[in-house]
């Protein structure tokens, strides 16, 4: 299994450099690939900030990537929940934090908007400090 960095995923998804995109695609097609949650966070930021991906386009791209038979995600179930919540309006990083805290009794934050969103979209018992 090969762990990949953000730039490999960005080249694969955006294809803005033909040579690198081809090498990324060949690697992903021919090898088992491990993608950590931190790489997904960075990938979301790059695609949103530099390539103007909407939440729906971003979620679709990450789901398609995760659906490839050679791709393995850290906490795939949590990532799937986070992508759903992201499409419902949560920030992707916040959604991933919430999904990662699934075993916690409550989620504490000073961010009142996040606390409301956590309770509405994610059905998480959020404690606003």
Where is each model-derived feature located?
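Active-site flanking residues adjacent to catalytic metal/cofactor-binding acidic residues
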Residues: 4, 41, 110
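Alpha-helix/helix-capping structural signal
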Residues: 7-8, 38, 112-113
